[in-house]
């Protein structure tokens, strides 16, 4: 009988800590495109819903890459024909974060992205170089090996947060918030 209550307690405490950030304004972050254009989040994204995917380790970046294709087809690719009016008007950015000693690798990562990433995706990838501590504290980044996703409303307030590998259920939850 003790197994059931213990498993319920463990399940309750395993809920993503990122849920604690809902309602907060996303902290200011300046990041760059592969062409070195600076984008300030959330300042430059106001007026539209914004989906952000952040990763700050090689392993989490690999998981972040698993989100590229499904998010591209769901939110970025423009529909044509009969479905032309049913696309989403949303900002989408995938942000690998280069901090500490890894900050020096930002330029190399940009050049690598130019060579290896589908050109259609490049405008949606931002490179952050700077400190991590503030974001870890304000966004409840607890595990470095997973990516974190945030949906911001038109004013930059976090209205949804999730983390980890891609799943259809997570994508459905994001879509519900954006609709």
Model-derived features: positions:
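Thioredoxin-like thiol-disulfide oxidoreductase module
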Residues: 101-145
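Cleavable N-terminal signal peptides
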Residues: 6-7, 17
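Thiol-/selenol-based redox modules, centered on thioredoxin-like
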Residues: 134-137, 144-179
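N-terminal "domain-start" segment that seeds a small globular fold
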Residues: 18-42, 66
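Positively charged n-region of N-terminal signal peptides that target proteins for export
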Residues: 1-5
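Short active-site neighborhood of thiol/selenol oxidoreductases, capturing the structured segment around
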Residues: 44-68
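Structural microenvironment flanking redox-active thiols in thiol-disulfide oxidoreductases
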Residues: 60-118
């Amino acid at each position: 009988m003790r197994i059931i209550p213990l498993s319920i307690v463990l399940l309750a405490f395993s809920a993503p800590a990122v849920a604690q950030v809902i309602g907060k304004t996303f902290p200011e972050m300046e990041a760059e495109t592969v062409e070195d254009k600076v984008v300030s989040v959330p300042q430059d994204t106001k007026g539209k819903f914004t989906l952000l995917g952040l990763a700050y380790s090689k392993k989490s970046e690999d998981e972040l890459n698993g989100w590229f294709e499904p998010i591209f087809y769901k939110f970025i690719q423009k529909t044509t024909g009969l479905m032309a009016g049913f696309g989403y008007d949303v900002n989408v950015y995938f942000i690998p974060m280069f901090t500490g000693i890894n900050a020096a690798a930002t330029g190399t990562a940009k050049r690598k992205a130019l060579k290896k990433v589908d050109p259609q995706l490049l405008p949606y990838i931002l490179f952050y170089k700077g400190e991590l501590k503030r974001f870890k504290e304000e966004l409840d980044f607890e595990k470095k090996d997973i990516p974190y996703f945030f949906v911001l409303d038109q004013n930059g307030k976090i209205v949804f947060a999730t983390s980890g590998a891609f799943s259809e259920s997570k994508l459905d939850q994001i879509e519900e918030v954006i609709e």
